[in-house]
Amino acid sequence: MKALWAVLLATLLTGCLSEGEPEVTEQLSWQSDQPWEQALNRFWDYLRWVQTLSDQVQEELQNSQVTQELTVLMEDTMTEVKAYKKELEEQLGPVAEETRARLAKEVQAAQARLGADMEDLRNRLAQYRNEVHTMLGQSTEELRSRLSSHLRKMRKRLMRDAEDLQKRLAVYKAGAREGAERGVSAIRERLGPLVEQGRQRTANLGAGVAQPLRDRAQALGDRLRGRLEEVGNQARDRLEEMREHMEEVRSKMEEQTQQIRLQAEIFQARLKGWFEPLVEDMQRQLANLVEKIQASTNSVLSTSVPQENQ
C-alpha cells in the first residue's frame, strides 16, 4: 500500500513540474529564405530564451535590457517585411486593380496583426518589470508564473499570425510571378478569335474580292502579332530588370564583405605595428640582462679560482 501511494505521489509531482515548465520547443514551420523570415527567426529565438525565465533573464528584465533587445528585433522584422512587400508590389505588373488591392489589404492586415502581437509582448514584459519593482523584496513567484503562462499564449498567437503572414506573402509573390504571364495570355485570348475570324472570312470570299480583303487581314494579323510580341518583350524586359536588380544587390553585398575583410586586415596590421616594437624592446632588454648575468658569473668564478690556489 505504501509503495502504491509513493508511485501516485511521484506521478502527481511529475505532472505538476511538467505543467510549470515553459513550452520553449515550438519552432516556426518554414525555411528562412527571405530576410524578413530570418529577422523574425532571430526575434523568435530571443523570445524562447526569455521564456525560460532564468536568473539572467530575470536580471535583464529588471534593468529593461530585454525590452530594449525586443524593440530592436521588432523594428528589424517589420522593416524587412515592409521592404519585401514593396519589392513584390513592384513585381506585380499587369494585374487587375481589384486583385492588387485585395492582396495588398490581406498582407497589410496580417502584417498589422504580427506587429500588434510583438507590441503586446513588449508591453507585457515592461508591466512585469514594474510589478517586480513594486514588490520591494517580496516573493515574485506568482508574478513569474503568470508571466510564463502569458508568454506561452503569446508565443502561440505569434506563431499563428507569423505563419498567416508568410502564406499571404506567398500568394502575393505568386501574383507577382504570374501577373505578366496572365496579362499576355489575356490579350492573346481576346485577339486570337478575331484573327481566326478574319482568316475564315477571307477564305470564303470570291477570287476578285478576296485579295484586297486578304491583304488587309494579313496586315491586321501582322499588327496584332507585332502587338503581342511587344507585350511579350516588355514582360521579358521586366524580368531582366528584376534579375539585374538582384545581381546588383549581390554585388553590393560582396563589395561590403570585401571592405570588411580589408578593414580587418588593416586593423591586424596596426596591431602588429603596435606590438612588434614592444616585443623587440623586451628581447633587447632580456639579451642585456643575460649578458650582465653571464658577466657577473664569470667575474665571480675568476675571483674564486685564485683563492683556492692559495
Curated annotation (Swiss-Prot):
Stretch list, region Homooligomerization? 258-310
Gene coding for it: Apoe
Annotated region (LDL and other lipoprotein receptors binding), positions in chain = 150-160
Region of interest (LDL receptor binding), ranges: 150-160
Q: Which family does it belong to?
A: Belongs to the apolipoprotein A1/A4/E family.
Gene Ontology MF, one: cholesterol transfer activity
- Among its keywords, does the record have Transport? yes
- Give the signal peptide, or none: 1-18
Localisation: Secreted; Secreted, Extracellular space; Secreted, Extracellular space, Extracellular matrix; Extracellular vesicle
What keywords sit in the KW lines? Answer: Chylomicron, Endosome, Extracellular matrix, Glycoprotein, HDL, Heparin-binding, Lipid transport, Lipid-binding, Oxidation, Phosphoprotein, Repeat, Secreted, Signal, Transport, VLDL
Question: How does it get modified after it is made?
Answer: APOE exists as multiple glycosylated and sialylated glycoforms within cells and in plasma. The extent of glycosylation and sialylation are tissue and context specific. Glycated in plasma VLDL.
sequence repeat segments: 72-93, 94-115, 116-137, 138-159, 160-181, 182-203, 204-225, 226-247
Domain of life the protein comes from: Eukaryota
Entry protein name:
Apolipoprotein E
